[in-house]
Structure formats: structure tokens, C-alpha cells
Amino acid sequence: MNDSRYIGRFAPTPSGFLHFGSLVAALASWLDARAVNGRWLLRMEDTDPPREMPGARDAILQTLERYGLEWDGEVVFQSQRHEAYAAVVDRLFNMGLAYACTCSRKQLEGYDGIYPGFCRNAGHAREGAAIRLRVPELIYRFSDRVQGAFEQHLGREVGDFVIQRRDGLYAYQLAVVLDDAWQGVTDIVRGADLLDNTPRQLYLQELLGFSQPRYLHIPLIVQPDGHKLGKSYRSPPLEADQATPLLLRALRALGQQADPALIGASPAEVLAVARQQWQPDNIARQMTVPEADLR
């Protein structure tokens, strides 16, 4: 298959080094793009400076290169896109589609993350407040390429959500939608922990007149206690001299062929074979895969 119109992306957060779970996500999105001769973009989701780890940006780029996951074009940094985000927040606020919220975390305790609408009609000034997007009492549905049909009632299951924090930083939901549209992304391949974020992004896409990408949410790699691999759980960083065995393990996590005969091959050779054999239909339709099952 050849689809040069395909544009995928990998968008890590520089809050730490890449780990095995990151590799599985990067590999899935890279293979999905390269298997159809599409483009694969790299975007650094660095909208939250307090969470950034010094040196993580460069380490992420170096790790991807060492593992043979080369990207197209220049790396995009969300920290350089604030003007675009601000313009859209202003637009939504001025249209009455967003409003200022002064609620504290303590006020919102006990609502299970569903905003109860305290500030919806309060008319607060924007200064020092968060900005929330009004959501409709509608069900948003989409078909995920792995997880299948998914739906969410935005009003009941999420409530009005933040697009700009009270400290002025822009929320993930806003930035990801604007950047995917700006970069022309047609296909989003990412972890299943973001599956329930998708309806919020569909709503924003609809409001702003953007095309809807195709979505593929892969199972998360989890530790024995059920927590996903991640920086907050001190998951070990990817080692440069383990690229080939870890790529083969990542292929197994994605339900792909991982020929043991390739153990002595270079990362580029492993990726060349995997690209030809990529079968996204073989990815398990489940939310998690225990890392212990892959050893």
C-alpha cells in the first residue's frame, strides 16, 4: 500500500527520558506511517516547563536516532506555538464558547473529575482565572482502528474542560488539536490511556472547523502492579546498546512478527523488515499488556 498523503506524528513530553512504553508508542506510529510511505513528524509537547527535565529534549532526539526512528522535517516545539494557542482561546472566549473559572482543586473534590459547572454563568474576569470550554449535552462517537467503537457523553462524563490554566499555560487538549491540524496530521497512533480524551478533541475539531484524523490507540505497557510504564514510576530509560532486542520486544507488544534471527541485526534492518510486515489488525484489542509477558 502507498499513501503519501498519510501524515503521522510522535509527540513525547520532555519530562524524562524515553522508556520501553514510549518505544512501543513511537514504533507503532512510525511503522503505521512508513508502511504506506507516509510522513512521520516529531513534536515536543513542552507546554509545561515546571515538569520538564533538563536535558530530556536532546536525550529524546538522540534515542530516537539511535533506534533508527528517523522523522521528517523539523521538530516542532509547542513552547514556540503560544501565540497560536492564545489566538484561539481569545476567539472561543469572545464567542461565548469558553469562560473564566476560579474554582480551586478543593472546591472540585468529590466530583470524580467531572466539572459541576460552578463558574459556567458567573461572568468572572479572565485575569488570574482558568479558561474552560463549554461542552454540549451530546454523545461523541468515533471508531478506533484497534479499540473499535467508542462513545462518551461530554456533559455527563467530562463537563466543561480547561483549555488554559490559571497560571497561563495551555492545556494539552487545546494544544494537541491545534498542532495536529496545523501540521496536517491525518492519523494519530498513541496509547490507550488517551482513548477517553478523544471525544474532547473531536468537539474542539468540530468547533474550529478542522478535519477529523483517524485514530489508533495501542495497549499500554504496564508493570506488575498495573501502573503504566512512565517517568513518574521511574521506568528505566532506553539503553543505546539494547536497540535491537528492545525493538523486537516492542514488536511483540504490538502483536507483530519478531524473528529471533534478527537479534544480531542493526535497528535499521529490524525496522526495514517490520515495515514490510506491519499488520495493525494484529494489535490486541485491549487496554493494557503486562511488560512481564514480553520477556
Swiss-Prot record:
**One of the record's GO cellular component terms:** cytosol
Q: Do you know which InterPro entries this protein is assigned to?
A: Glu-Q_tRNA(Asp)_Synthase (IPR022380), Glu/Gln-tRNA-synth (IPR000924), Glu/Gln-tRNA-synth_Ib_cat-dom (IPR020058), GluQ/Sye (IPR049940), Rossmann-like_a/b/a_fold (IPR014729)
Q: Which Pfam families match?
A: tRNA-synt_1c
Which enzyme class, named as a word? ligase
Gene Ontology MF annotations: ATP binding; glutamate-tRNA ligase activity; zinc ion binding
Asked whether the UniProt record includes Ligase among its keywords, one would answer yes
Keyword tRNA processing listed? The answer is: no
Note on how the cofactor is bound = Binds 1 zinc ion per subunit.
Q: What is its EC number?
A: 6.1.1.-
Tell me where the sequence motif 'KMSKS' region sits in this chain: 228-232
Alphabetical keyword list: Aminoacyl-tRNA synthetase, ATP-binding, Ligase, Metal-binding, Nucleotide-binding, Zinc
Placement of sequence motif 'HIGH' region: 12-22
Q: Which residues bind ATP?
A: 231
Annotated residues for binding of L-glutamate? 9-13, 45, 172, 190
Chain sites annotated for binding Zn(2+): 101, 103, 115, 119
Needed co-factor(s): Zn(2+)
Checking NCBIfam families in the record gives: PRK05710.1-3, queuosine_YadB
Role of this protein? Catalyzes the tRNA-independent activation of glutamate in presence of ATP and the subsequent transfer of glutamate onto a tRNA(Asp). Glutamate is transferred on the 2-amino-5-(4,5-dihydroxy-2-cyclopenten-1-yl) moiety of the queuosine in the wobble position of the QUC anticodon.
Q: Which family does it belong to?
A: Belongs to the class-I aminoacyl-tRNA synthetase family. GluQ subfamily.
Query: PANTHER family from the entry?
Result: GLUTAMATE--TRNA LIGASE, GLUTAMYL-Q TRNA(ASP) SYNTHETASE
What is this protein called in UniProt?
Glutamyl-Q tRNA(Asp) synthetase
Annotated organism of origin: Pseudomonas entomophila (strain L48)
Give the encoding gene's name: gluQ
